[in-house]
């Protein structure tokens, strides 16, 4: 067992992507020749990570209540595996936080809470709140899955996201009573840098720069994705 994985996949099944459609669905030809329809958890445009005839991996659930037994997990892009399952980043980050495996935050907290209400009228939920009895200001941490890349630079977002803009504004509104952090989960191992996706959502890019100036901390976390598991590679350089 490889102990440097922060997440280990169950046995995955190789195949070839035939098409992705209706946002949630992907037709895949398995190595055995069987054609299946898998669930696609990523409902965004998936720019550059849903090309037909690409190598992919799927997982299979034994839950009889599931409409689709297979879930699309990975795709190969330019000899790099990219994570497709958008449910994974938060699970991985939660595990890393609970095991204190994120060096940047090590020793700054001793309690992790998930999906905590915050913001105006407590109608929003932050992914994680980290607290420490000896620390006055709690850490509020939001996670964003990042798969788009251009010239080895990871970019977020890949489309206009009013929800993402709202999250940036709400993190700014926490200052100065909390330490807000936006963590970008770079779901591919080939990017050394991170930038806001200005070409895809200029409004987000503007808010991103405002957030940095006001004191929102940005953690662009690099991960290597393999069919066996996920490794943490450290922080990407910010470029903006």
Curated annotation (Swiss-Prot):
GO terms of molecular function: DNA binding
Domain of life (superkingdom): Bacteria
InterPro entries hit by this protein: SfsA, SfsA_C, SfsA_N
Family: Belongs to the SfsA family.
PANTHER family: SUGAR FERMENTATION STIMULATION PROTEIN A
Protein's recorded name: Sugar fermentation stimulation protein homolog
């Amino acid at each position: 067992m490889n102990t440097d994985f922060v997440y280990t996949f169950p046995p995955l099944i190789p195949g070839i992507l035939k098409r992705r459609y209706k946002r949630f669905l992907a037709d895949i030809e398995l190595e055995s020749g069987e054609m299946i329809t898998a669930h696609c958890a990523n409902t965004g445009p998936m720019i550059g990570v849903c090309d037909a005839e690409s190598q992919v991996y799927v997982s299979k659930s034994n839950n009889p209540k599931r409409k689709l037994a297979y879930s699309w997990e990975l795709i190969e892009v330019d000899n790099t595996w990219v994570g497709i399952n958008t449910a994974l980043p938060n699970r991985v980050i939660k595990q890393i936080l609970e095991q204190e495996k994120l060096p940047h935050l090590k020793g700054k907290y001793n309690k992790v809470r998930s999906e905590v209400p915050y913001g105006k009228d407590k109608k929003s939920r932050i992914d994680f709140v980290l607290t420490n009895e000896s620390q006055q200001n709690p850490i509020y941490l939001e996670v964003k899955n990042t798969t788009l890349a251009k010239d080895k630079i990871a970019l977020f977002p890949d489309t206009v996201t009013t929800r993402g803009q709202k999250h940036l504004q709400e993190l700014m509104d926490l200052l100065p009573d909390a330490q807000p952090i936006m963590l970008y989960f770079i779901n591919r191992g080939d990017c050394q840098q991170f930038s806001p996706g200005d070409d895809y959502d200029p409004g987000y890019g503007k808010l991103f720069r405002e957030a940095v100036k006001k004191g929102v901390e940005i953690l662009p976390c690099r991960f290597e994705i393999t069919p066996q598991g996920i490794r943490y590679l450290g922080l990407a350089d910010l470029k903006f």
